[in-house]
């Protein structure tokens, strides 16, 4: 199943990349646990990491600070490794309200969640790839430090089928039910199976477009074949197949029975303590809720909120870390922490917020104390589990620098020859009028401007002022969700407007080559929005344009400003020197607007062609590229309905055509899901 990593790129490493690749590989081979890659905006950090992965041939997990950047990295890695397993592992909740209790108003909030099925399938595909092969790159968000099913139990539950094996039909159906597959002879979809005589069709939970047909003769498996679940066309016959559980949380029956006894013992102890403390209402509430859960587990093998009993189900002791995605990563795996100055503090903060909420639930009798062990990893547990790690950032934090022993791999020179922006400091008194004249200069030559302010009020007032003076301006603030944010960035790049105003504005990761000016108002107000790292990240947004410039408005130069200006000038000098020595003329980036959202777009087309079904990809490609993420979501629902209708009418050609369109649309939508 595994293949060697094969890097697919028209470019060879250039600029600082060859040296960075060499130093990182040497460090990994010498056994260094921590290394830091300081790569400026637009220097090709992802390409450098892809080269390291391809050269060392090691399974890799890439941690990103949010879904948007994870989606962008997933798209890039898919293009670099089209023949290998590039997987995507982020939270599968479109909406999630954890259960909580507010003592002051005596309000209990039930858990409420909406699961994105496509992302759930991709998570299952990610763990399957890690268990089966070595040529795997998993792009994950901080979701990777949250509890997942125990890999040992997960492996125990798998159903192995081989041609010629002796097994009766009822045994297969019983095993499928234990894996939480449901029988559905009408609507054949992911995580279901259907039975027709001695033929069992199974739609694997981790698969998007292929199903398994098991043909029995008496009690022997006569034939195994993979087929298209939509058209019924057989793709290939195989000798063996492994069916993985429908969720990561399946548990063998004997483990559930054992866990139930342990839960009963804990309930007895907890009831005694509550009665001694005269907490009779809480004791009655806890007894009722726990006994209901136990009855559900006894009858069905699971219950709502079963994750709260995960300590017993995975056989852990009190306080032990939960199994996570890190337990699925091989021992010689590699961890890459992207935008580490943001991701590392995030990992540290997850445990404390979760703990505070659960302690209230335990205290007031909604949960047993063992529910506290259903939690994300503590930071020290993450450190203990993490394999050899490369931290990637334009502005590494103190933690990464300390762990790397101050040794930083510099990647300052860009392959395109682009220089860091010129920085000017101008007085605050005339900042708004000065900014207006600068905006007009940029708008006249079809370039864009980013403006960052300190407060929401100032951002609103500035937007209003610029609009009154005839400028095309939009305002980005924290109330805007991911989908709208992507739309605004897209519209800025397309030239629907010229100026984007924000507060903690668009720092990490997103590429906007059209932006030639970044204006930072009140740059001399020392604080987290005007720290050295914040300033360098914000200035870096203009580093993808040949005419890149940053204007810092301030009446004095603060220590943070001095450091940010000093670091930017150091980089600019190094870049200029390299360009002069090698005769390089800086070139602007012509990055297509769709690239922000187009995840593995070309891969989806290639995959479709490989199956002889590319006819729809070409037809639909043009339409979808101009659609907003909101429209994409509506289009997906609409097309799914059409596809099922065609399949019911036995119009398989049309159904397959729509299915190929859906492949592309879903890839595009991941960024906004």
UniProtKB/Swiss-Prot annotation:
Compartments in which it is found: Cytoplasm
Gene Ontology terms for molecular function: ATP binding; ATP hydrolysis activity; DNA binding; excinuclease ABC activity; helicase activity
Cited CDD domains: DEXHc_UvrB (cd17916), SF2_C_UvrB (cd18790)
Domain Helicase ATP-binding: 26-183
GO cellular component entries: cytoplasm; excinuclease repair complex
Entry keyword set: ATP-binding, Cytoplasm, DNA damage, DNA excision, DNA repair, Excision nuclease, Helicase, Hydrolase, Nucleotide-binding, SOS response
Domain Helicase C-terminal: 431-597
Chain positions recorded as ATP binding sites: 39-46
Motif (Beta-hairpin): 92-115
Positions in coiled-coil regions: none
Known function: The UvrABC repair system catalyzes the recognition and processing of DNA lesions. A damage recognition complex composed of 2 UvrA and 2 UvrB subunits scans DNA for abnormalities. Upon binding of the UvrA(2)B(2) complex to a putative damaged site, the DNA wraps around one UvrB monomer. DNA wrap is dependent on ATP binding by UvrB and probably causes local melting of the DNA helix, facilitating insertion of UvrB beta-hairpin between the DNA strands. Then UvrB probes one DNA strand for the presence of a lesion.
Name of the protein: UvrABC system protein B
